[in-house]
Amino acid sequence: VTETRKYRSPSREQAKADTREKIVQAVVRVVLDDGLHAFTVQNVALKAGVSHRTVYRHFTTRDELLDGLAESLDRIAAGSTVPTTPETIDDVIVTVAPSFQAMGEVRDAVRAYVITSLALNWQDDNRRKRTLAFDKAIGAAFPQLPSKERREATALIRHLASTRAWYALTVEGGLDDAAAARAADWAVRTLFKDLGRRDRAAAKARS
């Protein structure tokens, strides 16, 4: 008796996801290999080895291509054991160093993301949500701080925990991923310690 083996093709949804990721990786290669000036839907299609129509089915504009890159990085971050959107300052503290190490594992994608977001003055929705989460966590931890000081601290700490800080410390500063992670971790902890001191002083002054 001859056994009939059934060939199971990938599901349609998985095939779509694979194509989408292939296109996203093509964005990375276009930006890093050919330059930001070459970042067009057509060039991404050529780099991915797919038709312009195929790209258009997934992403209709450059901004949507960048959203796709951001979503790809978010999926990687979601697979880690640290919180991606902090609820407390402890979440921020435990996130910084592991996040920097994770960025180093997908450094080309992070480099492309930072280059394009800065050059095009663009940021994705999740980045904005994380910024608001940082502000809420810091405000809850240091309720006596004047709003001006809190905003300044939030902006700096948010930057230190970002892809842009990783880029500045590694690509521009020449640190390896481990050293960059230590530097950012130290800076965030130092700032929180100082904010605690200032918050206590403000509370005492008001009592």
Question: For each predicted feature, which ranges?
Answer:
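Amphipathic alpha-helical linker/stalk segments
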Residues: 29-33, 38-39, 67-95
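Alpha-helical DNA-contacting segments of helix-turn-helix folds
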Residues: 31, 59, 64-73, 114, ...
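Amphipathic C-terminal alpha-helical segment
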Residues: 154-175, 190-200
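Short hydrophobic/aromatic patch on the recognition helix
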Residues: 49-59
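Basic, helix-initiating cap at the start of DNA-binding domains
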Residues: 1-49, 64
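Amphipathic alpha-helical segments used for helix-helix packing
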Residues: 68-73, 98-121, 132-136, 167-168
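Amphipathic alpha-helical packing segments from all-alpha helical-bundle domains
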Residues: 91-94, 98, 102, 118-155, ...
